[in-house]
Amino acid sequence: MSQQLLVITGVSGHVGFRVLVEALSRGYKVRAVIRNASQSEQIKATDSVKPYLAQVEFTVVPDLLVPGAFHGILDGADGVVHVASPLPSGSDNFKRDLIDPAVNVTVNILKAAKEVSTIKRVIITSSIASLLTWDYIISSDSTKVFTVRDTYTPTNLEGPFANAMDAYGVSKAAAFAATERFIEEEKPSFEVINILPSMVIGKNELNRKPEEVGKGTNGIILGVLLNNKSETPTLGVSVHVNDVARAHIDALNPVIQGNHNYLCSSGGVEGTTWDDAKDIVRQHLPKAVADGIFPLEGRQPSRPIRLDSSETEEAFGWKFASFGEQVKSVAEHYLELSVAK
């Protein structure tokens, strides 16, 4: 294992950072792709990465969309873990700034990998957005059980879109479809595995201040524990970030079926009820509740979604961490930073 080299993109993000830590802790050497040099200092300063500095090198690629951006970056690698993907921003040109980049970066790295004979597997971070159309999300149906085989190919990439999250879902589904098309048409020598997480929850070690803990999907948990009263339902499915990272690195193992896809979500088909976070924190962090650090005045309606990820648990041989573990991970990190402030 110590002789194997991985190239990992997106290491400055919530999932990508944990994938980096998981890979290093298992003895992989890692070539981590970042967009600016300052990101490497922040990553190297974390307690989880410090013990493994001799195993990691950072490579700056300012624009992953440039043709040939990965030229030379993948040389000598045994595997690639592609996590980087654009997130919704303030732009309303969703095709230009969200959908096209998601597709083009993925195809860019697949083309580069095809030129490197040593690469055996490419692992790509997809999303349950590759399963769920916006029309389904806003429907009243909560009976359909989705498996990893229920992906769809979006036919409308131009819009209009209902909102940024509608466009984000299309971007992930389009990137997934482009990956499948690449495998079919190019027939690369390496195998490709897509990992499809639901709402990713768990400590993000790159957040160093309490006000940063609420960034991204962890903000759903923190909003409930503090005082954010949302009226808009959020998909009631979640997964621990550590499990998502574990799945990415496990997927490199040749005993795991290649050219296959794996759904990552906890709680079985019943999924997650976001407001349960209050009872979890009352039970596990009663002093923080009594001290007013967690007023528990928030509210987050859950949109029931039924996902069956049992095939992933069977393939990898472990169970997804509970919603309780996810909540504790976020709450304890917020508490730690609040006390240290």
Question: Residues of each region from the PLM?
Answer:
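Conserved Rossmann-fold NAD(P)-dependent oxidoreductase catalytic core, especially the SDR/UDP-sugar
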Residues: V21, H82, D92, D97, ...
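Active-site Tyr-X1-5-Lys
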Residues: P154-V192
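A conserved pocket-lining segment of Rossmann-fold NAD(P)-dependent short-chain dehydrogenase/reductase
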Residues: L157-N163, N207-V239
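Mid/C-terminal beta-alpha module of Rossmann-like enzyme folds, strongest
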Residues: L235, A245-G298, F323, A331, ...
